[in-house]
């Protein structure tokens, strides 16, 4: 399960105003430091206090390791500066995407947002179990402020889906990539070519399995239907895992146990892991060093190229939007309260 810290690092959003910075060479009150403008988006300010509100866990860790005057340590100060730079870029991205969601008319309704926020929150909480509250507290979030993080993720995802909706990868693109990168598609170990479908819940997985068994659809049809979902961060996910060795595959044990008895072309019943419910398909067996045929890795290549094209399209649109919204980031202001070595 993804940790709260990782989710917070990917989202980089929130509303809680908190600061734990010290004084620098120029005497300023803490309130003045917190109000320092470190970026603007369409004239709207982002303050250092907003940035530091996402670093409470970092500050607590630094204080525990280096003592109360941790910000006076140039090495620690440099680490905090890097964290601030990462956070402010995330906050800028969130504001830009929020503005564009409204402009494009693609912002989900409040009801849709609440439903998705509640679902994701409960999934994260359930996945982390007893560690959730402690992890949330360690990162400086309450349940409400963490839900604000997820809310921004939901809005951002809507814009990202809009940006990449027309991105396509053709069979010709995939063939060209294969021909130019054949060395990437050599079996690193002896094992079974493995694909799987990953569903959010047991009901969806069982329905898909039953439809495959009844002949209403096929595993390959569903794989094609869902193969772009991974890049769009939504389930069901269709994924080609390549050649999976019998030992030391790095996969969770439940998945390995589900794959083991399958013969070529067979599929498993829905298998529960910490990630959801899988339907696994076993493909051909390959020896270490064997060149994998194009048809066996085509779906894998399409996913690689789709992710590349999605990233390029997203970056191009974001760069233009930042220009249109006159985004400015004041890197020097991110050094407030820190003793940075020159």
UniProtKB/Swiss-Prot annotation:
Lipid attachment points (N-palmitoyl cysteine): 23
GO cellular component: plasma membrane
PpiC domain sequence ranges: 189-284
Topology in the lipid bilayer: Lipid-anchor
EC number: 5.2.1.8
Catalytic activity, reaction form: [protein]-peptidylproline (omega=180) = [protein]-peptidylproline (omega=0)
One GO BP annotation of this record: protein folding
Compartments it resides in: Cell membrane
Signal peptide range in chain numbering: 1-22
GO molecular function term, any single one: peptidyl-prolyl cis-trans isomerase activity
Annotated keywords: Cell membrane, Isomerase, Lipoprotein, Membrane, Palmitate, Rotamase, Signal
Similarity section: Belongs to the PrsA family.
Function (record text): Plays a major role in protein secretion by helping the post-translocational extracellular folding of several secreted proteins.
Name this polypeptide is given: Foldase protein PrsA
Annotated source species: Clostridium perfringens (strain ATCC 13124 / DSM 756 / JCM 1290 / NCIMB 6125 / NCTC 8237 / Type A)
């Amino acid at each position: 399960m993804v940790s709260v810290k990782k989710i917070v690092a990917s989202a980089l959003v929130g509303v809680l105003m908190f600061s734990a910075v010290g004084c620098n060479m120029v005497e300023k009150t803490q309130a003045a430091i917190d109000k320092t403008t470190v970026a603007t988006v369409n004239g709207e300010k982002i303050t250092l206090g907003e940035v530091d509100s996402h670093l409470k866990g970092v500050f607590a860790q630094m204080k525990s390791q280096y003592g109360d005057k941790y910000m006076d340590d140039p090495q620690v100060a440099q680490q905090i500066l890097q964290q601030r730079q990462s956070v402010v870029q995330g906050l800028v991205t969130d504001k830009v995407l929020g503005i564009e969601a409204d402009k494009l008319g693609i912002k989900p309704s409040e009801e849709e947002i609440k439903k998705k926020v509640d679902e994701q929150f409960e999934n994260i909480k359930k996945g982390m179990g007893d560690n959730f509250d402690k992890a949330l507290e360690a990162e400086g979030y309450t349940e409400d402020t963490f839900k604000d993080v997820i809310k921004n993720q939901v809005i951002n995802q809507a814009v990202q889906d809009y940006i990449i909706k027309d991105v396509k990868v053709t069979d010709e693109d995939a063939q060209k990539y294969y021909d130019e990168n054949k060395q990437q598609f050599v079996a690193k170990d002896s094992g079974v070519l493995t694909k799987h479908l990953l569903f959010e819940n047991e009901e969806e997985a069982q329905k898909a399995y039953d439809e495959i068994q009844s002949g209403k659809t096929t595993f390959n049809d569903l794989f094609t239907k869902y193969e772009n979902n991974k890049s769009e961060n939504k389930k069901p996910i269709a994924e080609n895992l390549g050649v999976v060795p019998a030992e030391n595959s790095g996969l969770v044990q439940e998945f390995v146990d589900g794959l083991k008895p399958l013969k070529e072309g067979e599929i498993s019943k829905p298998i529960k892991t910490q990630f959801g419910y899988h339907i696994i398909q076993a493909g051909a067996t390959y020896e270490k060093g064997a060149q994998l045929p194009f048809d066996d890795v085509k779906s894998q290549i399409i996913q690689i190229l789709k992710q590349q094209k999605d990233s390029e399209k997203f970056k191009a649109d974001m760069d233009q939007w930042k220009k249109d919204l006159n985004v400015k980031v004041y890197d020097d202001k991110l050094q407030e309260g820190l003793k940075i070595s020159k």
